[in-house]
Amino acid sequence: MPSLLSTPKLAPVLARLRGLSGCMSCLQRRYSLQPAPVKKIPNRYLGQPSPVTHPHLLRPGEVTPGLSQVEYALRRHKLMALVHKEAQGHSGTDHTVVVLSNPTYYMSNDIPYTFHQDNNFLYLCGFQEPDSILVLQSFSGKQLPSHKAMLFVPRRDPGRELWDGPRSGTDGAIALTGVDEAYPLEEFQHLLPKLRAETNMVWYDWMKPSHAQLHSDYMQPLTEAKARSKNKVRSVQQLIQRLRLVKSPSEIKRMQIAGKLTSEAFIETMFASKAPIDEAFLYAKFEFECRARGADILAYPPVVAGGNRSNTLHYVKNNQLIKDGEMVLLDGGCESSCYVSDITRTWPVNGRFTAPQAELYEAVLEIQRACLTLCSPGTSLENIYSMMLTLIGQKLKDLGITKTSKESAFKAARKYCPHHVGHYLGMDVHDTPDMPRSLPLQPGMVITVEPGIYIPEDDRDAPEKFRGLGVRIEDDVVVTQDSPLILSADCPKEMNDIEQICSRTS
């Protein structure tokens, strides 16, 4: 899905990322990365799937599908290593990281939205219940990243559980996630006096709290008190994002699963496309095929844009009829076991590209192929974006859409493709948004590559045959030391393949 062009300028980020690998090799020699001693998971339903109740989803030792207690513990150690590096000059200071869960949001009285955990909280512990707090606390007299991990969670409550379902409680939280300690949520208040001390540096995202009530009850008074001292609260958001930017092999495997099942859903949706057809039907078909293959939810409201509506980049009304002879642009993805996909394909609903549609489609496809070859270590999304604009400018001229000089080709390219070439991808669709696109890519980063050309029907500068056409082609890409790994490789994008799928009979 396209994102805005603006990116924050964070010059120190690159150096910090480069320094992390060396720090981690040292960390692995000096500190245990094992979670707390394994405790038997209660033989009952918890507030989320466990290896006991959902053995078809989780293996023993896993917190979420495919991700073990050891991996979550390693993430926490990496974060505390970054805290140690950021806090140079505060060697005698204790450090406490506080991360809030999401609350339950309601669409109306007593009618909740499907709960989705805050992804920074989820990344660090895997706990999927609302109204919870994760605390990582350094040991006095011991060097970071040595620390204690604590969860503060809702109490077991038979009355509420009758209505809302089971809760993990403190015993379930420890046994499932592998944190060192767990307490009822209200006991967090007893930790606050220690956090107020001048000797304790608190790391917490007070500018954008994920849970307004917990922030108001506990963290806002603490933040205001610390603001009057020399030891102010420091943000932890960017540190977590720097960790999330580079995926582990286990994370990449989850994203491969999401990419594969989304690709299969696209194929079935293409096959179901007959003219005329309602955008709402294709929306429903795509969601069904994702969910039927194991997706938890859609990653975002999909764009299902027929005809000229494809020129509205984030069109999500999806309520119009697509006529015979028109194309549909479907930008969709799913979330599977905490990781998402984000794929775009454009195809004719009657199964046959017209000559102008084929010209424009092939132009975008050639641009996308060229951009994919650039997805290697050392380049950046900004570099790929510049190449995309150059190629679009040339294609616009070749198609007779513009007659501009080379000097003004970039301006024309931005007119007909007003979005960036891509963004980082992971637990979120627009993942790690504070990480600049100017960062050199490195193995383990996952990005999207999504060039497009959009020609509104009222554009009098373009040849009439192209007016009202919009094409975008988007793939999900893992940067490796060798050639890029295309997570969406199973999703057809060659014109012959698309036409063959749309014309199949069974």
UniProtKB/Swiss-Prot annotation:
Named cofactor requirement(s): Mn(2+)
Short name of any one Pfam family annotated for the protein: Peptidase_M24
This enzyme's EC code(s): 3.4.11.9
Gene3D superfamilies tied to this protein: Creatinase/methionine aminopeptidase superfamily, Creatinase/prolidase N-terminal domain
Catalytic activity: Release of any N-terminal amino acid, including proline, that is linked to proline, even from a dipeptide or tripeptide
GO CC term (a single one): cytosol
CDD domains for this protein: Prolidase
SMART domains: AMP_N (SM01011)
Coiled-coil spans in chain: none
Keyword entries, A-Z: Cytoplasm, Hydrolase, Manganese, Metal-binding, Mitochondrion, Transit peptide
Taxonomic superkingdom: Eukaryota
Region (Interaction with TNFRSF1B): 54-79
Binding site for Mn(2+) 2: D331, D342, E474
Tissue: Expressed in brain, kidney, heart, liver, skeletal muscle and testis.
GO molecular function: aminopeptidase activity; manganese ion binding; metalloaminopeptidase activity; protein homodimerization activity
GO terms under biological process: glomerular filtration; protein processing
Regions that span the bilayer: none
Transit sequence range: 1-31
Record localization: Mitochondrion; Cytoplasm
InterPro entries documented for this protein: Aminopep_P_N (IPR007865), Creatin/AminoP/Spt16_N (IPR029149), Creatinase/aminopeptidase-like (IPR036005), Pept_M24 (IPR000994), X-Pro_dipept-like (IPR052433)
Main location class: mitochondrion
SUPFAM superfamilies membership: Creatinase/aminopeptidase (SSF55920), Creatinase/prolidase N-terminal domain (SSF53092)
Subunit text: Homodimer. Interacts with TNFRSF1B/TNFR2 (activated) and TRAF2.
Family: Belongs to the peptidase M24B family.
Protein name: Xaa-Pro aminopeptidase 3
Organism: Mus musculus
UniProt lineage: Eukaryota, Metazoa, Chordata, Craniata, Vertebrata
